[in-house]
Amino acid sequence: MASRKEGTGSTATSSGSAGGAVGKGKGKGGSGDSAVKQVQIDGLVVLKIIKHYQEEGQGTEVVQGVLLGLVVEDRLEITNCFPFPQHTEDDADFDEVQYQMEMMRSLRHVNIDHLHVGWYQSTYYGSFVTRALLDSQFSYQHAIEESVVLIYDPIKTAQGSLSLKAYRLTPKLMEVCKEKDFSPEALKKASITFEHMFEEVPIVIKNSHLINVLMWELEKKSAVADKHELLSLASSNHLGKSLQLLMDRVDEMSQDIIKYNTYMRNTSKQQQQKHQYQQRRQQENMQRQSRGEPPLPEEDLSKLFKPHQAPARMDSLLIAGQINTYCQNIKEFTAQNLGKLFMAQALQEYNN
């Protein structure tokens, strides 16, 4: 994933300027107790995101962009967006922060909502739970509390149903990211698990009345589809690819568990050595005391037994979260196909 799109520096700069505007609009001056209960998206934004992926998304390459809108009480209204342009690392003259500011300034001149309220990203078979996404969303949410990230799945959408979800970091994870302490003890103290990292926010897509009337007319004019078309099974390629990605993440989790178990064994071994050293030291001092000799001076055990560095556990949580996402996708895929098989069987028995 390109650093320009998910680098915390550029995101924080542009979000910070938008954050003050959002605070003004709410009249709170950036209160910390507000929460987003719902995300309302204009149909234009959805079409722009889909069009952006169709024009620039290829294979595993993701597309990203900025979401614009405003906050109304506990509802985040996304009214417009613009994409990040595709460019290579050789484009040293490109300034992504300047690009964002110029785009928002241009939108303001034509009286379009220009407040920065989040960002969007496409995903490849649900592969979006990454450290880069975590860092970017933390940067956005730290600057503007109501910020969300929209995840668009083009593969699911191509199968006939729009897949667009909004996520935010949970308050617990925000506190851990602020402290930047991802040690096992810190995560255990904060009660952070992969299930408590992201929270999904309900999405409502809103269209104007004229667009709703047009869609109603188009639906009336559209050709009647085969009544049995909905019973067609989805392609097995999706299931195979999801299983392959799931196995890759399980392998990564296995390697991470091995590293953590090695750390625990080394720590336990060092504790035993420290305990044995203290016992020997105590026995030697007792012998010296019986001979009337002064005890040996105390030594700094931290210098003799340097503690092992605990591995950071955030990557493990992200891998576990991604595994959970793959499992949910596979569950949805198989449930739909099994339902179609049972319906097809019932229809066949009825016709016979």
Swiss-Prot record:
The principal location of this protein is: cytoplasm
Q: Which UniProt keywords apply?
A: Cytoplasm, Initiation factor, Isopeptide bond, Phosphoprotein, Protein biosynthesis, Ubl conjugation
Cross-link Glycyl lysine isopeptide (Lys-Gly) (interchain with G-Cter in SUMO2), where in sequence: 303
According to its UniProt entry, the protein's GO biological process terms are: formation of cytoplasmic translation initiation complex; negative regulation of proteasomal ubiquitin-dependent protein catabolic process; translational initiation
Q: Where is the composition biased (Low complexity)?
A: 270-289
Where is each MPN domain found?
39-173
Keyword presence, Ubl conjugation: yes
Q: What's an example GO cellular component term for this entry?
A: eukaryotic translation initiation factor 3 complex
Q: How does it assemble?
A: Component of the eukaryotic translation initiation factor 3 (eIF-3) complex, which is composed of 13 subunits: EIF3A, EIF3B, EIF3C, EIF3D, EIF3E, EIF3F, EIF3G, EIF3H, EIF3I, EIF3J, EIF3K, EIF3L and EIF3M. The eIF-3 complex appears to include 3 stable modules: module A is composed of EIF3A, EIF3B, EIF3G and EIF3I; module B is composed of EIF3F, EIF3H, and EIF3M; and module C is composed of EIF3C, EIF3D, EIF3E, EIF3K and EIF3L. EIF3C of module C binds EIF3B of module A and EIF3H of module B, thereby linking the three modules. EIF3J is a labile subunit that binds to the eIF-3 complex via EIF3B.
Can you name this protein? Answer: Eukaryotic translation initiation factor 3 subunit H
What's the source species for this entry?
A: Mus musculus (Mouse)
